[in-house]
Amino acid sequence: MLPKVIVHNSISLDGSLTNFEPNMELHYQIAGSFKPNAHLIGSNTIEAGVELYEDGVPPEEEKDFEKPQRDGSLPYWVIPDTSGKLQGLLHTCRRFEFCRDIILLLSEKTPKEYVEHLRERNY
């Protein structure tokens, strides 16, 4: 059986994906209504979201080093980040209430320091 793929984006009335501020709570409520197992989210999207919606990056806390224990019906966030761009930002994703946990897609060229950083935080 092939997986069912749904593309869900928030866009402005003129079709733009940039230069507007979407209601992310509504975005993820709608996305969640499809009952997905996972969301594929780009590292640029994560980086832009942290800049747009966070008042600076909060410091990591002890609980950020543990896998969250959330409802199993929530989707995983699958994020390609082979360069380590999101080092120091991923804990903000893990705290997001509509995210079960983070799955990172890496490559053989991913910096070893980043891989160790992820291991220390149980990603």
Locations of regions flagged by a protein language model:
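Histidine/lysine/aspartate-rich catalytic loop segments that bind and position anionic ligands
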Residues: 99-123
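N-terminal nucleotide/polyanion-binding subdomain common to many enzyme families
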Residues: 1-95, 99
